[in-house]
């Protein structure tokens, strides 16, 4: 992050703009809206500045840049068409430890001005860090179309109710649940937009009188195979509403960065052959936190119901009467194969696909005879340590030794690596790959040479 987004309280604080043209006028308008005590220093001024000065809204200082004007300032903007003057303003501000924006020169500035969506008191700022102002403007226009004009009225009304909410609801969890009901109430929003005070009061009283659901809940969310762009919209909504997120090592840092900032995070990383936290203890963590009335998200790589032990976790909650729901995710087989250019089914090569765990319970055995059948694709999860056995068993039960195989490491991420060969090489290839990795076996693997789009590795 090259710039820290902040919102400045400038009301009744001295600010300086150097420049008297159209660009300076746009900056001045923003500072005046923010309530700043504004001084504008320039050789000449466009008429709007004179209008503002005559109305007592700002002070004009005609002449060359006078750096003593910075002595009482909190913030400065250099908006002339002379790069040398702009640099002088920046240097003078820097020497006084005053933040200075230099128009169209982000490297010379100590702060930049974002594109703004104003639904006061709700403000949304969009910035490209000065690298692409046009992109920031396009995003702002998109957001403008998505955010209702009356959103500011809703936010302002919420501010009026804060003391009452704090008095009526004792815990942060209760208050958050109330506000969630408040902000999704379309009738209230429309009544505020229509200035229908009677309807606003009636809806408000109904919201305060309705009992809150004090029970906690658990939501199993599939995070997908790695690329944060593959997280579903519903999954994103859930992790941004969570009180606590219980996650494993297959959840990428990019996805964890999307979690609500003040949510508690509990790492229960697991991998085949090693469990940081035993499964039964994970079950109890989910149960214990939900019984405290918290909204718990169990965030799992891939899909929670495909070799994710999600069913076991939900059984514990079901027996305890804890409400739960499931948000599916893109499973590793689908994501990794797509990002490797390997279609799992193809009318010429595979009429079915089998998802198989390579990590069996002690004494377990797979149906190797059916797995070795023709015209299908096999995808082994957690199979690296068993790769040599998989190779041996499939050949022993009749699969052709030259059957194409691929191993996908860190699938769908920028670190994705794919090694491929034939079945007789599977055990050897597995030595070149680190977990997390997926094994794909089938004629469709040969299509990778033509269909690989994501990586040349």
UniProtKB/Swiss-Prot annotation:
For region Uroporphyrinogen-III C-methyltransferase, the annotated ranges are 216-448
Binding locations of NAD(+): 22-23, 43-44
Question: Hey, which pathway is this one from?
Answer: Cofactor biosynthesis; adenosylcobalamin biosynthesis; precorrin-2 from uroporphyrinogen III: step 1/1; Cofactor biosynthesis; adenosylcobalamin biosynthesis; sirohydrochlorin from precorrin-2: step 1/1; Porphyrin-containing compound metabolism; siroheme biosynthesis; precorrin-2 from uroporphyrinogen III: step 1/1; Porphyrin-containing compound metabolism; siroheme biosynthesis; siroheme from sirohydrochlorin: step 1/1
> PROSITE patterns attached here?
SUMT_1, SUMT_2
Return one GO MF term: uroporphyrin-III C-methyltransferase activity
Recorded hits in InterPro entries, A to Z, give: 4pyrrol_Mease, 4pyrrol_Methylase_sf, 4pyrrole_Mease_sub1, 4pyrrole_Mease_sub2, CobA/CysG_C, NAD(P)-bd_dom_sf, Siro_Cobalamin_biosynth, Sirohaem_synt_dimer_dom_sf
From the UniProt record, list the reaction(s) this protein catalyses: uroporphyrinogen III + 2 S-adenosyl-L-methionine = precorrin-2 + 2 S-adenosyl-L-homocysteine + H(+); precorrin-2 + NAD(+) = sirohydrochlorin + NADH + 2 H(+); siroheme + 2 H(+) = sirohydrochlorin + Fe(2+)
Give binding positions for S-adenosyl-L-methionine. Answer: 225, 301-303, 306, 331-332, 382, 411, 437
Give any Pfam family that matches: CysG_dimeriser
Q: Which residues form the active site?
A: 248, 270
What is known about its subunit structure? Homodimer.
What is the role of the protein in this entry? Answer: Then it catalyzes the NAD-dependent ring dehydrogenation of precorrin-2 to yield sirohydrochlorin. Finally, it catalyzes the ferrochelation of sirohydrochlorin to yield siroheme.
State the protein's name: Siroheme synthase
Q: Which organism is it from?
A: Salmonella typhimurium (strain LT2 / SGSC1412 / ATCC 700720)
UniProt lists the gene as cysG
């Amino acid at each position: 992050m090259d710039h820290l987004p902040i919102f400045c309280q400038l009301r009744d604080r001295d600010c300086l703009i150097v420049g008297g043209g159209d660009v300076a006028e746009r900056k001045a308008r923003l500072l005046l809206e923010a309530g700043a005590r504004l001084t504008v220093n320039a050789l000449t001024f466009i008429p709007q500045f004179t209008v503002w000065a005559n109305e007592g809204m700002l002070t004009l200082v005609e002449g060359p840049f006078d750096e003593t004007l910075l002595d009482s300032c909190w913030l400065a903007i250099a908006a002339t068409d002379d790069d040398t003057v702009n640099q002088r303003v920046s240097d003078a501000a820097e020497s006084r430890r005053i933040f200075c924006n230099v128009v169209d020169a982000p490297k010379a500035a100590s702060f930049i001005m974002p594109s703004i969506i104003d639904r006061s008191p709700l403000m949304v700022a969009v910035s490209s860090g000065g690298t692409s102002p046009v992109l920031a403007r396009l995003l702002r226009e998109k957001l403008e179309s998505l955010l209702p004009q009356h959103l500011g009225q809703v936010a302002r009304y919420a501010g009026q109710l804060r003391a009452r909410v704090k008095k009526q609801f004792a815990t942060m969890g209760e208050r958050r649940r109330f506000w969630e009901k408040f902000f999704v109430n379309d009738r209230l929003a429309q009544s505020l937009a229509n200035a229908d005070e009677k309807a606003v009061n009636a809806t408000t009283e109904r919201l305060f009188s309705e009992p809150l659901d004090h029970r906690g809940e658990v939501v199993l969310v599939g995070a997908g195979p790695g690329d944060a762009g593959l997280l579903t919209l519903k999954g994103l909504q859930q992790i941004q509403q969570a009180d606590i997120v219980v996650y494993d090592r297959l959840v990428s840092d990019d996805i964890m960065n999307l979690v609500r900032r003040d949510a508690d995070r509990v790492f229960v990383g697991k991998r085949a052959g090693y469990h940081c936290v035993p499964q039964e203890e994970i079950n109890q963590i989910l149960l214990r936190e939900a019984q405290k009335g918290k909204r718990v998200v169990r965030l799992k790589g891939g899909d929670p119901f495909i070799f994710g032990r999600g069913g076991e976790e939900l059984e514990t909650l079901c027996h305890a009467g804890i409400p739960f729901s499931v948000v599916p995710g893109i499973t590793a087989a689908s994501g990794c194969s797509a990002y490797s250019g390997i279609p799992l089914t193809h009318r010429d090569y595979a009429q079915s696909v089998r998802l198989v765990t390579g990590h069996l319970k002690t004494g377990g055995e797979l149906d190797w005879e059916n797995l070795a059948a023709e015209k299908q694709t096999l995808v082994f999860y957690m199979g690296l340590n068993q790769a040599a056995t998989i190779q041996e068993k499939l050949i022993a039960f009749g699969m052709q030794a030259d059957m194409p195989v691929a191993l996908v490491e860190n699938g769908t991420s920028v670190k994705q690596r794919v090694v491929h060969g034939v079945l007789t090489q599977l055990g050897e290839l597995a030595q070149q790959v680190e977990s997390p990795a997926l094994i794909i076996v089938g004629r469709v693997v040969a299509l990778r040479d033509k269909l690989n789009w994501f990586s040349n590795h």
